[in-house]
């Protein structure tokens, strides 16, 4: 299988369970990398029986219609910010965040506290943020969505924090995935805040580094800016992100952080992929997702060719037409 790097922990646990329940199935070495990288690898090699992405657009844009013709949205996570507690700015932000947890959401004081948090992260000249590349990792553009939504929510100006970070090259360090950013934080404190982070990765990663004696944590964000609440879909859509690199320009829609999965048309072992997804949709699998900060979408939502979904999976999914109020978080046209 090939899957978004932030699914590494949940999917590794599911693969271990798969080995237990299906001892006769040989499991190949999974590739956990940026969603775009994984999808392009499948388009080039057709080696995967399963491909999973951390957004709703990568699989359709890269694999439809020649390599896959549907995707199943199975979980939603939320953006968080990983904080280096070994730096003064990190300590200050964490202290303010704890204060915000005691304040009434949307009150004047709560708004002021969140403004102070983002001022430190985005405006202070001596802080540097870590972000991933929008072209290799969805969390790269999703981090930009968070900054724009924070500007809109707290400053009534979507560009306020985005400009402060992305218009100043010294303000951010960009890598292909958020895993690479954690290494930067750990090795030399060169970034104090990682904006390209999901709960699904922040929970196990911060635990791992804490066990190594490094003082880092993550802070959660309000639902109206964390891309983790489907009921805020219309607010998320008030902003979008345009990114240019090496002459290539792309505009990204700010959608909830939804994990999707497909079984490619040329899957070498389709039945093993079906069995994995049956495990994922089982009570055991759903608990594994929750353990890593992924809220299951039940039933799963099929975008694309519903009739191509294997029969065994049908009891656990519905076509997008059945939940049309969520259609705007998927690409505009079905294949």
Residue ranges with predicted function:
Residues 71-73, 120:
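Short, charge-rich binding segments
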């Amino acid at each position: 299988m090939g899957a978004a790097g932030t699914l590494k922990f949940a999917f590794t646990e599911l693969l271990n369970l798969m080995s237990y329940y299906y001892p006769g199935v040989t499991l190949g070495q999974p590739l956990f990398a940026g969603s775009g990288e994984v999808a392009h690898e499948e388009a080039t090699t057709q080696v995967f029986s399963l491909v999973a992405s951390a957004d709703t657009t990568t699989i359709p844009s890269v694999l439809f219609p020649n390599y896959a013709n549907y995707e199943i949205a199975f979980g939603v996570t939320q953006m968080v910010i990983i904080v280096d507690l070994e730096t003064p700015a990190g300590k200050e932000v964490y202290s303010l965040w704890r204060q915000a947890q005691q304040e009434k959401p949307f009150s004047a004081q709560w708004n002021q506290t969140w403004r102070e948090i983002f001022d430190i992260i985005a405006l202070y000249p001596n802080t540097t943020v870590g972000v991933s590349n929008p072209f290799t990792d969805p969390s790269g553009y999703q981090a930009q969505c968070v900054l724009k939504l924070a500007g809109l929510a707290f400053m009534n100006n979507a560009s306020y924090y985005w400009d402060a970070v992305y218009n100043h090259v010294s303000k951010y360090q960009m890598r292909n995935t958020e895993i690479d950013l954690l290494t930067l934080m750990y090795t030399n404190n060169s970034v104090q805040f990682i904006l390209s982070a999901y709960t699904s990765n922040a929970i196990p990663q911060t635990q791992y580094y804490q066990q190594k004696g490094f003082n880092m944590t993550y802070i959660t964000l309000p639902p109206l800016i964390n891309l983790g609440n489907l009921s805020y879909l219309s607010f998320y859509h008030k902003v979008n992100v345009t990114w240019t690199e090496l002459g290539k320009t792309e505009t990204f829609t700010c959608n909830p952080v939804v994990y999707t999965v497909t079984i490619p048309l040329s899957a070498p072992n389709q039945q093993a992929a079906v069995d994995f997804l049956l495990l994922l949709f089982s009570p055991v699998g759903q608990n594994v997702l929750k353990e890593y900060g992924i809220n299951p979408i039940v039933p799963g939502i099929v975008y694309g060719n519903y009739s191509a979904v294997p029969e065994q999976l049908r009891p656990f999914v519905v076509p997008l037409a059945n939940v049309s109020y969520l259609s705007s978080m998927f690409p505009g046209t079905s294949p």
